[in-house]
A protein has these predicted regions:
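Glycine-rich beta-strand-centered segment in the early N-terminal region that forms part
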Residues: 25-42, 56-104, 138, 143-146
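NAD(P)H dinucleotide-binding glycine-rich loop of Rossmann-like/cofactor-binding domains
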Residues: 100-181
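Rossmann-fold dehydrogenase core element
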Residues: 268-270, 280-320
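Local beta-strand N-terminus motif with an aromatic residue
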Residues: 89, 175, 220, 242-243, ...
Length: 347
């Protein structure tokens, strides 16, 4: 099969080509619950750039060369003898984690914290290829309204945004405020999920005019340009109190300190983006009673819920398509901020 293969790390992201488009050996069924999916779309994620940089080298513990791509959807190509409920040609979306289902975390539905798991595209070969080896437990059948190439990024970007917005929606009442920092690939999904799940007023912050336009089209009530005065703008919109919930899809630079400042007393700050550090005096945490919540992908059940929203047209993913052979173009465009929404590779 053809695949876009990572052969070496590039800490400065300065190479002309990050991956090599080449022929590799097809994956094979090895376990009764294995499934081979013919890829219809593979999302290109900023995590992939971090992988190229080598940031995930110690966590993923993979040997190069290997194939990235952890946001995948397609059609059943082949299934192991123990797989039921699927047949060849069924359109599916792949939860990003392959788990056994036996550990306590799995039985509680906390797929992300399974004691034993494989994360195709992170610690095993992923979907920057014509076919992908995954497990039946990770697959969700797609309704006829949703094509694999249109939904692939929901498996990580969409699911991560959904989980954070779902958490926030539980604490948001009509007349209250939610701030979303970053209206890019994850943020524009988070806006729509919040809009679908609660009646809070949504304030979106971004530095790019195009991203702010996208935010308005996704249902934001207010947009604020990140020009240095965004904290004051949010405080003005919220009567000086700040927002009950702040979802930070940036998580680096000054976004963290500003996000916490925008969070009202007894409010919730959800951190999704990463790369920075949270540094806050404990006395400030005590007196403000703010809650900081981390977010890691989402559960199988939450991906089912997100697909239900997409099926009803309540969430619409903005994508830009690239042929698999142009994976380097997609990665460079993402690195330089030229991708509105999410990039998707089509084999």
């Amino acid at each position: 099969m053809k695949a876009a293969v990572l052969h070496r790390y590039d800490e400065t992201l300065s190479a002309k080509e990050f991956v090599s488009f080449e022929d590799v050996v097809d994956p094979r069924i090895e376990n009764p619950t294995d499934v081979i999916v013919r890829i219809g779309g593979a999302g290109v994620c900023r995590t992939d750039l971090h992988i190229v940089e080598g940031i995930w080298r110690e966590k993923s513990n993979v040997n190069l060369p290997y194939i990235m791509g952890h946001e995948n959807a397609g059609w059943i190509e082949e299934a192991g003898k123990g797989v039921t409920g699927f047949k060849k040609g069924d359109p599916v979306i792949c939860h990003p984690l392959v788990t056994s289902g036996h550990c306590l975390a799995c039985r509680r539905g906390d797929d992300m914290h399974a004691e034993e798991s494989v994360f195709p595209g992170i610690n095993a070969n992923g979907g920057y290829a014509q076919v992908l080896l995954t497990g039946a437990r990770s697959l969700i059948k797609l309704p006829k309204t949703l094509a694999p190439k249109d939904v692939a990024p929901y498996t990580d970007a969409g699911l991560t945004a959904y989980r954070a917005a779902k958490k926030a929606s539980r604490h948001l009442l009509p007349g209250q405020y939610a701030v979303i920092i970053g209206a890019g690939g994850l943020g524009h999904i988070g806006i729509q999920v919040l809009k679908a799940l609660c009646a809070a007023e949504i304030i979106v912050i971004d530095r790019a005019p195009g991203a702010l336009e996208l935010a308005l089209s996704c249902g934001a009530h207010h947009v604020v340009k990140a020009d240095g005065d965004e904290v004051e703008a949010v405080l003005s919109l919220t009567g000086g109190h700040g927002a009950e919930a702040v979802i930070d899809f940036v998580g680096e630079g000054d976004a963290i300190a500003k996000g916490l400042t925008m969070t009202r007393n007894a409010g919730f700050y959800y951190i999704v983006g990463y790369g920075g550090r949270i540094d806050i005096p404990t006395i400030d945490m005590i007196t403000s009673e703010k809650t900081i919540v981390g977010n890691l992908v989402g559960t199988y059940a939450e991906l089912v819920e997100l697909m239900a929203l997409a099926d009803r047209g309540l969430v619409d993913l903005k994508t830009r398509e690239y042929p698999l052979s142009a994976a380097n173009d997609a990665l460079h465009d993402l690195h330089h901020g030229r991708v509105p929404g999410r990039a998707v590779l089509i084999p």
